[in-house]
Design a protein with these regions (language model features):
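Short beta-strand segments
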Residues: 27, 57, 136
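N-terminal phosphate/diphosphate-binding loop that engages ATP/GTP or pyrophosphate donors
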Residues: 37-111
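Phosphate-binding/switch loop-helix module in NTP-utilizing enzymes
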Residues: 102-135
């Protein structure tokens, strides 16, 4: 039985369907407990087995700036390095914040609120491009 993509919105996208087993959601009960590390290892293992694997995180906070002032998505960069994947950082996370608060608070402070449509569209694009997507 086919299942609709978890980001499917009736009337908002085509009838494209996705096997739900292609996405793996990594969660934890706190910060600094190893979610990103474990996610990186999962992506690495998938890639080593010849799978087209990707990483997606809707928002991340506590990021450093490059010399040009742009923000570096730290968790995405870490996963990219530990796993060896070449997925562009820009498609890994649509919302990157500097302040080291929860993303919802950092988004308010920085005046760049998270829009669910942007998160869904980014996730959908990654799902369309890769065989396996890990979501943190």
């Amino acid at each position: 039985m086919e299942k609709k993509c978890p980001c499917y919105v009736e009337g908002k996208n085509t009838e494209k369907r996705m096997d739900m087993s292609k996405a793996l959601f990594i969660t934890g009960t706190g910060t600094d407990i190893g979610k990103t590390y474990v996610t990186g290892l999962i992506v690495k293992k998938l890639a080593e087995e010849g799978k087209s694997a990707a990483y997606y995180k809707a928002a991340m906070s506590g990021n450093d700036r490059r010399a040009d002032g742009s923000l570096i998505p730290g968790d995405a960069l870490f996963v990219q390095k530990i796993s060896g994947i070449t997925q562009p950082l820009e498609e890994m996370c649509p919302y990157v914040y500097e302040h080291a608060y929860s993303p919802h608070l950092a988004s308010r402070i920085e005046g760049h609120p998270v829009e669910m449509a942007v998160v869904r569209d980014g996730y959908r694009a990654v799902c369309d491009k890769y065989d396996y997507v890990t979501v943190e």
